A protein has these predicted regions:
Chain A
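Aromatic- and glycine-rich beta-strand/loop motifs that create alpha-glucan
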Residues: 1-25
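Secretory targeting signals
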Residues: 35-37, 53-56, 62, 96-160
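Hydrophobic alpha-helical transmembrane segments in multi-pass membrane proteins
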Residues: 22-27, 64, 68, 101-118, ...
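Hydrophobic/aromatic residues in alpha-helical transmembrane segments
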Residues: 67-74, 147-148, 223, 227-228
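Terminal transmembrane helical anchor/hairpin motif
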Residues: 39-53, 162-165, 169-239
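Membrane-embedded or membrane-proximal helical elements that form or frame transporter/channel pores
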Residues: 37-78
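Helix-loop-helix units of permease transmembrane domains in multi-pass membrane transporters
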Residues: 74-103
Length: 239, 303
């Protein structure tokens, strides 16, 4: 088994053994369920419209959930930090291991958040495709939050400060469309497209699997993971 | 089994290493070498620089100046493969409290590229069999320390670095740790405050004071001769070459490029030849190395 897969298995096992995974899934399922009931479902709306609103706002929740997962994984691993720093493994293997564990937890979180949306489907409204596309959009938003959280914690000494830094970056990206209105037209399109959920979850929330949006979100995630690996390698030498 | 270090090379070379935390010096121009198989104790009071030096050797801290080589590798090199030849137990053992002892050691063995039986072997070696299935978070301090040592040796390293391995252990646990360390066939560098234990484990002692190496002596120096340290001149024949010319290849031991162990009877001739070649003699030591001498260095109290 490769080092990254071994680390991923350990981290996922740790999430399970400490109860953090179940607390995460329960909280996420509850928050998303309440969100659907409170904001999305309205008797004047069609089921498609309700699901679209649910999957749009829920994507922001998934980004936050990814950040929380990153913070949890880093805090859990801190006491044994010296283990990887003295082991013959590279920083990117450790980051990949943590990311894989977090991505699996994010995937489970998406499934745990689908219970009320599935009830909509079970009642004869909406479609399986809409739920799948919305779930994919959520997953991509979640792993982006996770990767940005890992990047922040890799660069800063305190995990909480790192997760907050990752969150600030995410918020800054999501606010880009507001900045876009105030800049020259040449930059406007670029800045508008930088917002992960605002600009790249639109197709998913409407039940369409858009490959270009998936590529953008995965590309941003990959860039964050590369940054995390660089930061982690530098931390190997930190006092 | 990890690959051996290059033949004849010292297991550890520390050459002019300094380390500063902001403007505060933790190590100042420390130089020494450790031969393969040697057991060396790093002594000094709190804040003397022991932990900083061990962290630099373990490759988790970079020196502000100077050069380090350990197990045939420069710790700063990008390829981390050399770490398979190193075992390190820091002051706080790097443990995952949520895992069982056996699962944790299997995990560490796999990360360090050891064979499948390594975890079972080290569990028996460290007498952890009765606790193998227990969660690490539920173990006493003594057993946590033992698991920490097990993770450092699970992959059978060539060089083992231990930072206060006996801290907080009761007498029985300390004796068990000593027996275990005496049974290991590797190069050992450990820091400890327990002078009586150090005297039983180590064959050589390095004393740090305010970041400087102030004493370097061995348990058998009186029998084996004297230790000579040289500041080489920029030109002319190297110190090593002069020693070969004066006493022959078999009558001295090169600890590193600048430190040699020579027979007591040769010291006058060697010193004359080195000075004539322009080299500076930094130290010529023939200490006795006993527990009483260690206690004399540090006074009644442990360092």
């Amino acid at each position: 088994m490769s080092a990254a897969r071994r680390i991923a298995a350990r981290e996922l096992g740790a999430l399970h053994r400490t109860g953090a995974l179940w607390a995460f899934l329960g909280t996420l399922g509850l928050v998303q369920g309440l969100h659907l009931l409170a904001f999305a479902v309205d008797e004047r709306r069609t089921s498609e419209r309700a699901l679209a609103i649910f999957f749009h706002h829920g994507a922001y929740v998934m980004e936050a959930a990814g950040l929380v997962l990153a913070l949890t994984l880093v805090v859990m691993g801190t006491p044994a930090d010296m283990l990887w720093r003295t082991a013959p493994i590279r920083a990117h293997q450790r980051i990949a291991g943590r990311f894989i564990a977090g991505a699996v937890a994010t995937g489970l979180g998406v499934l745990a958040s689908m219970h009320l949306a599935a009830l909509v489907l079970w009642s004869g409204y909406g479609s399986v495709g809409h739920l799948v596309a919305g779930g994919v959009g959520w997953f991509l938003a979640g792993v982006l939050g996770l990767a940005l959280g890992l990047a922040g914690t890799a660069f800063l000494r305190r995990p909480l400060a790192g997760a907050i830094a990752g969150g600030c970056l995410l918020v800054a990206l999501e606010l880009m469309p507001m900045v876009a209105d105030r800049v020259r037209p040449g930059w406007r399109a670029v800045l508008t497209e930088a917002a992960p959920v605002w600009a790249h979850n639109d197709a998913f929330r409407r039940g369409i699997l858009d490959l270009s949006d998936a590529v953008f979100l995965l590309g941003l995630t990959y860039a964050a993971l590369v940054a995390a690996s660089v930061g982690q390698e530098d931390r190997r030498w930190a006092p | 089994m990890p690959p051996p270090s290059p033949d004849g090379a010292p297991a550890i070379v520390v050459a002019g290493v300094s380390r500063f935390y902001a403007a505060q010096p933790a190590l100042r121009g420390v130089s020494f070498g450790v031969a393969p198989g040697e057991r060396v104790a790093l002594l000094g009071r709190n804040g003397a620089g022991k932990t900083t030096l061990l962290r630099i050797l373990a490759g988790v801290l970079d020196p502000s100046a100077g050069r380090v080589q350990i197990a045939g590798a420069d710790p700063s090199e990008p390829d981390p493969g050399w770490r398979a030849r190193l075992g390190f137990l820091p002051e706080q053992p790097p443990l995952h409290d949520d895992m069982s002892v056996a699962a944790y050691l299997e995990y560490v063995a796999e990360l360090r590229g050891a064979d499948a039986a390594a975890a079972e072997r080290v569990i028996a070696q460290c007498e952890l069999g009765s606790h193998a299935g227990r969660r690490i978070g539920t173990l006493s301090h003594g057993f946590r320390q033992r698991v920490g040592l097990a993770q450092a040796i699970v992959h059978q390293p060539q060089v083992l670095l231990l930072d206060e391995p006996a801290a907080g252990l009761d007498p029985a646990q300390t004796a068990a740790l000593r027996t275990l360390l005496q049974s290991l066939e590797l190069t050992l560098l450990l820091s400890s405050h327990l002078l009586s234990e150090v005297a039983r484990i180590a064959t050589r002692y390095l004393v740090l004071e305010e970041g400087r190496l102030v004493r370097d002596f061995g348990a058998s120096d009186e029998q084996e001769g004297v230790r000579l340290r040289v500041e080489p001149a920029s030109g002319g024949p190297a110190p090593h070459r002069i020693l070969v010319d004066v006493v022959g290849t078999t009558s001295f031991e090169a600890i590193d490029e600048c430190t040699f162990r020579i027979a007591t009877g040769d010291r006058a001739a060697v010193c004359r030849a080195l000075i004539a070649a322009g080299h500076e003699l930094v130290a010529l030591e023939r200490p006795t190395s006993t527990l009483s001498e260690l206690e004399a260095i540090f006074g009644e109290a442990a360092p």
